[in-house]
UniProtKB/Swiss-Prot annotation:
Keywords on record: Ribonucleoprotein, Ribosomal protein, RNA-binding, rRNA-binding, tRNA-binding
Keyword check for tRNA-binding: yes
Similarity annotation: Belongs to the universal ribosomal protein uS13 family.
Subunit structure, interactors included: Part of the 30S ribosomal subunit. Forms a loose heterodimer with protein S19. Forms two bridges to the 50S subunit in the 70S ribosome.
MF annotations from Gene Ontology: rRNA binding; structural constituent of ribosome; tRNA binding
Name assigned to this protein: Small ribosomal subunit protein uS13
Biased composition (Basic residues): 91-124
Physiological role: Located at the top of the head of the 30S subunit, it contacts several helices of the 16S rRNA. In the 70S ribosome it contacts the 23S rRNA (bridge B1a) and protein L5 of the 50S subunit (bridge B1b), connecting the 2 subunits; these bridges are implicated in subunit movement. Contacts the tRNAs in the A and P-sites.
Any single GO CC term annotated in Swiss-Prot or TrEMBL for this entry: small ribosomal subunit
Length: 124
């Protein structure tokens, strides 16, 4: 199992698919990383068939040119925290755990709001 950017890649998958297991790398970036390897890595190569040199090459490309995993997560959470600290509308929506980008909340938005809680009326 090859370890790239601190992640164990699944050994039976092709390298272009396996790179998508790294947070911050999608289909497009995975193909770009392989292209930047200057033909040293074939996209159809399985992870188990990668040599140590090829794995190191992937590591160096990812470290130099991409923000992935912890670094990317820290940047995103820092951006959200900046909105919250400035007291902006987006920050308040994040603080209240409501949709940030203008979606309706009378119905839907269950992902952000969580499981339904009944707000019943009290009998007199």
């Amino acid at each position: 199992m090859a370890r790239v950017a601190g992640i164990d890649l699944p050994k039976n998958k092709r390298i272009d698919v396996a790179l998508e297991y790294i947070y911050g790398i999608g289909k497009r970036n995975a193909k770009d990383v392989i292209a930047k390897a200057n033909g040293q890595i074939d996209p159809t190569t399985r992870v188990k068939d990668l040599t140590e040199a090829q794995a190191n090459l992937l590591n160096t490309i990812l470290q130099k040119e991409y923000k992935v995993e912890g670094e990317l997560r820290r940047e995103i959470s820092g951006n959200i925290q900046r909105y919250v600290d400035t007291g902006s509308y987006r920050g308040n929506r994040h603080r209240k755990r409501l949709p940030v980008r203008g979606q309706r909340t009378k119905t839907n938005s269950r992902t952000r709001k969580g499981k339904r809680r009944t707000v019943g009326s009290k009998t007199k």
